[in-house]
Amino acid sequence: MSSTRTNIFKQMEKVNNSSKVSSQRVLNPNSIKDALLRWVQNRLEGYPNVSITNFSSSWADGMAFCALIHRFAPDAFDFEKLDPKNRRQNFELAFKVAEEHGICPLLEVDDMILMGDRPDWKCVFTYVQSFYKQFRDYP
């Protein structure tokens, strides 16, 4: 057998073995949601005025969105100058900087303002997934 064919078989074996492992660990919607929540919590640990416990109320003042994009674009703005009471300004800043860094604008500032203290968790979750996809390989 040629070495090329041998390498192809080795690669196929790796794929087959990895699929056996992944099939043993079934991902369901709740485990995916929990994993993304943990990813965000780890990235935002230590940010003032940011406490991530869910994909709804934790994001209502815009500070979490600002912290998340600031984590990956720290030179874009001074996080310390932000005020949780300035919701509109926080959303505008976070969404603008996120878009400049490759995150699709899936949320609208006016919608977030209208949702008040309890944004739709599915909307926030979907938007935060975009951050994960864009920045998952960053330390």
Regions found by a protein language model. Give the residues of each.
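Long, intrinsically disordered low-complexity tracts enriched in Pro/Ser with mixed acidic/basic residues
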Residues: 1-58, 67-139
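Active-site nucleotide-donor binding segment shared across nucleotidyl transfer reactions
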Residues: 61
